[in-house]
Amino acid sequence: MPAAISRNWPAPAKLNLFLHINGRRADGYHELQTLFQFIDCCDMLDFKVTETPELILHSNMSGVVADSDNLILRAAKSLQQTTGFNGGAEIWLDKRLPMGGGLGGGSSDAATTLVALNKLWHTQLSTEELAKIGLKLGADIPVFIHGFAAFAEGVGERLQAVNPSEPWYLVIAPDAHVSTADVFQDPLLPRDTPKLAIDTLMSQPWANDCQKLVVSKYPQVAKALGWLLEYAPSRMTGTGACVFGEFTQQQQALAALAKLPSEMQGFVAQGMNLSPLITRLSHP
């Protein structure tokens, strides 16, 4: 009897509510202090366990194999190799999040793959063990596996659960692809923000150390951020290109969205301190 398809596994987007760069390590990675929060806008994945070890991915992206697709298959393969599981999976990705942009969609897809297949394959790895696999694939993946809003240090892997407010956001996705590698290699990127205690960071105005550099190089990001600042406190997430404005009420965010210039793409979402992936994990 063929296995049933396990449906509707969410892979939520994240925002970096602040992002500080504290230095550069000998291995080239950067020391960071950042605050991750999820938003209720997600890619969705379905999974079917197979008896043979093949990993097959289907996507709604018109046959385009994107980085997130590759990361999904790499995550599944890593779980197979770590656990010795000799079956496989067929995976369907419904891609709804903007590609790249600093929302973490590819990392989130990989995290959901690890969490879902660990359950469906009955491989019984702990959250920490899954996070170790995820960290080898991408620095942002552990926060999606743990599934709670978090203050992160190191390269982003040392996580401390936090409970910031859950406002409404208007997220704008400029028509620009910002290379994370290029941003972190740029000599003009500030790398000397002092490390601060979490209590201090949570109570002071929030900023993104990558924003000034990206805005100077990408006029589309500068234009989107400039427009958004007319309506709400706003900044960039990750290394961009997405920017977000913060609103206390949904109606305020929707009212601003209604005025969005036609050449810009945006959406309204609410902050979430608990990932919908964790909620889904408790269901069959």
From Swiss-Prot:
GO annotation, biological process: isopentenyl diphosphate biosynthetic process, methylerythritol 4-phosphate pathway; terpenoid biosynthetic process
Coiled coil: none
EC id: 2.7.1.148
Active site: K14, D140
InterPro entries per record: GHMP_kinase_C_dom, GHMP_kinase_C_sf, GHMP_kinase_N_dom, IspE, Ribosomal_Su5_D2-typ_SF, Ribsml_uS5_D2-typ_fold_subgr
Family matches, as SUPFAM superfamilies: GHMP Kinase, C-terminal domain, Ribosomal protein S5 domain 2-like
A Gene Ontology molecular function term of the record: 4-(cytidine 5'-diphospho)-2-C-methyl-D-erythritol kinase activity
Catalytic reaction list: 4-CDP-2-C-methyl-D-erythritol + ATP = 4-CDP-2-C-methyl-D-erythritol 2-phosphate + ADP + H(+)
Enzyme class: transferase
Binding site for ATP: P98, M99, G100, G101, G102, L103, G104, G105, G106, S107, S108
Keyword Kinase: yes
Functional summary from the UniProt entry: Catalyzes the phosphorylation of the position 2 hydroxy group of 4-diphosphocytidyl-2C-methyl-D-erythritol.
Protein name as it appears in the record: 4-diphosphocytidyl-2-C-methyl-D-erythritol kinase
Chain's gene name: ispE
